[in-house]
Amino acid sequence: MAQKNTKKSWVLLQLGYLVLCLLVGAAVGLLIGHFFGSSLANQIRHVSITYLLATFIVSTILHIIIHEGGHLLGGLLTGYKFVSFRVMDLKLEKSESGGFKFRWQHVAGTGGQCLMRPPRYQSQHFPFRLYLAGGFLANILTSVWAYWLWPNIYVFVFASLGILMGLTNAIPMRFNDGKNLLLLSKSELNRLVLFIMLEDNYWANRGKSYDEKYRYLRRVTINETNFLTDATIFYDLEQLVDQGQFEEVYILAKKIYQEREDMVTPYRQEILRLLLFAASLQHPEDPLITTLLEDPLLVAMLKTKRPENSTAQAAYHWRVKGDVVTALEHLAQAKKRLPRAHNLRAQEQEARIIDYLEEKLQAEQVNAE
């Protein structure tokens, strides 16, 4: 019953988010029509639909860059240091040597992301507002400035899209900057968790662990449930995977799967993948595996070219299907996809999992001969 209620709440939340986006879009459209309707109507008569569509596509990409650039500028102005900048699936990272490199990374539910290393954490004095607000402020201000300088139909498309993107990020909803600002403004716990997440990401990009996070977390009680505090769950799961405690991974991931259907999409997908991996290894007869493979979120995730998806499928084909050959093919695929891991630490962990599975599979092949 609790799981059904959670699912109902999650569906209502998604519908509420969609309705709010539609209302914001309608409000922006009405205001634009009221102030600029007659002028734009005259211009539209002489404009190609193909050009307008191309303008929309280019404007979308530009506003993702502008949005993440706003986060970058806001962070630099308040003591943050650059870690990575992602637009769609193309990611620019700063290496430990100080150089830069490009690589591919897909993160469900996000068009881009600018991650930075925060300044040293000080209770009540942790800067977060300009870093978080920089994105939607950049979208809105750039849009207004552009249309003021060049008031034509193409810039109108650019400006309208930017204002809409800015407002839907500024108004607190689900998993956006406005919601982050609201959560951090209300709670020091959330501010501490954001600091830990950003600092941990900095070290993960260098292939190193950040054990200080456990010291920070031991000093507080996680008594809030939101997409910031939910991130701390994955620290425990990552540690268990690294230690090869796959039964404990199964137990914890299954508990979260059953109790937390309201998790944001990227988190929910990661829980589904981890549960498929651990259930396949530890409980290949579990009927839950079939349910997992029918979940649209997991189906979509397994299509992305990431090494952890290939290792999960290798575990499934080996233990559930008894198909060693296909399992080894997935492991070979996982090796090729290692550069697409979230960060260097995740890449190294995934390489260890591949070695572990390969050793088990090869031993099974030898015993079968």
Residues covered by each model-derived region:
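Membrane-embedded alpha-helical segments that form the functional core of polytopic membrane enzymes
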Residues: 45-65, 154-167
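Alpha-helical adaptor scaffolds
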Residues: 238, 242, 261-313, 318-322
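Topogenic membrane-insertion module of multi-pass membrane proteins
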Residues: 1-56
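TPR/TPR-like alpha-solenoid helical repeat scaffolds
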Residues: 267-279, 307-312, 343-366
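Alpha-helical repeat scaffolds
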Residues: 211-222, 246-260, 283-300, 323-335, ...
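Small-residue-rich helix-interface/hinge motifs
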Residues: 54-118
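Polar-ligand-bearing catalytic/cofactor-coordination segments
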Residues: 77, 114-119, 173-260
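Hydrophobic transmembrane alpha-helical segments that form the core helix bundle
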Residues: 111-112, 117-208
